[in-house]
Swiss-Prot record:
Protein name: Probable aquaporin TIP4-3
Locus of motif NPA 2: 196-198
GO cellular component terms, semicolon-separated: membrane; vacuolar membrane
Topological category with respect to the lipid bilayer: Multi-pass membrane protein
Gene: TIP4-3
Length: 251
């Protein structure tokens, strides 16, 4: 099983690391601008995420923008756009904890800038929507929902992007985006289906609403690293291991 790598402060001056951090800031900005913007547009057009059509539109927008941004950043920073993804990959030894902290700071800044810009561009006509559990959904259930949804997301990231034995290639980011969209359809009416502390942080900052914000840190930061540990421990296989060859007729 992979071990955590602490890293070193010298990473902060490494040109490759700096490019990756700037990429995470920009990619997260663009992701949150489209994702939150789609939720604001759905609310403006009527119903928002409280209707099946609004929820489907928001889920589709998130799925598409996640797929594109992960693909765009894959060979620069990994296209994390999410502190839970970053920590989940750190749990598997794929990124140092020091670089993870730099990524998370960039992701939070990108999300904040996106939401502040959205608030300015819309002139306050539509409030920036903040993640919160639905009425009747307690904090514990919301945390559990976010943990499960984020586990699903990270499991997909490992299986389709990280695990080099899988012949997925360029389809990996698209499949990750589809999981995000499906999870929003499944969990949106209950916890909001954030799966991403940065995605929740920007709107909370722009709206000044922090009452339930902790849920969207605790749940994803449980589910993400847990998925990394499970996939690394059970599915990655020892170094140098190659899966058995398959025939076309095999299941």
């Amino acid at each position: 099983m992979a071990k955590l790598a602490l890293g070193h402060h010298r990473e902060a001056t490494d040109p490759g690391c700096l490019r990756a951090v700037v990429a995470e800031l920009l990619l997260t900005f663009l992701f949150v601008f489209s994702g939150v913007g789609s939720a604001m547009a759905a609310a403006k057009l009527g119903g928002g995420g409280d209707t099946i059509m609004g929820l489907t539109a928001v889920a589709a927008a998130h799925a598409l923008v996640v797929a594109v941004m992960v693909s765009a950043g894959l060979h620069v920073s990994g296209g994390h756009i999410n502190p839970a993804v970053t920590l989940g990959l750190a749990a598997g030894g794929h990124i140092t904890l020091f670089r993870s902290a730099l990524y998370a700071a960039a992701q939070l800044l990108g999300s904040s800038l996106a939401c502040l810009l959205l608030a300015a561009l819309t002139g306050g006509e539509e409030a920036v929507p903040v993640h919160a559990p639905a009425p009747g959904v307690g904090a514990a259930r919301a945390v559990a929902m976010e943990a499960v949804l984020t586990f699903s997301l990270l499991f997909a990231v490992y299986a389709t992007v990280v695990d080099r034995r899988r012949a997925v290639g360029a389809l990996g980011p698209l499949l990750v985006g589809l999981v995000v969209g499906a999870n929003i359809l499944a969990g949106g009416p209950y916890s909001g289906a954030s799966m991403n502390p940065a995605r929740s942080f920007g709107p909370a900052l722009a709206a000044g609403e922090w009452a339930d914000h902790w849920i969207y840190w605790v749940g994803p930061l449980i589910g993400g690293p847990l998925a990394g540990l499970v996939y690394e421990g059970l599915f990655m296989g020892p170094p140098g291991h190659e899966p058995l060859p398959r025939n076309d007729g095999d299941f």
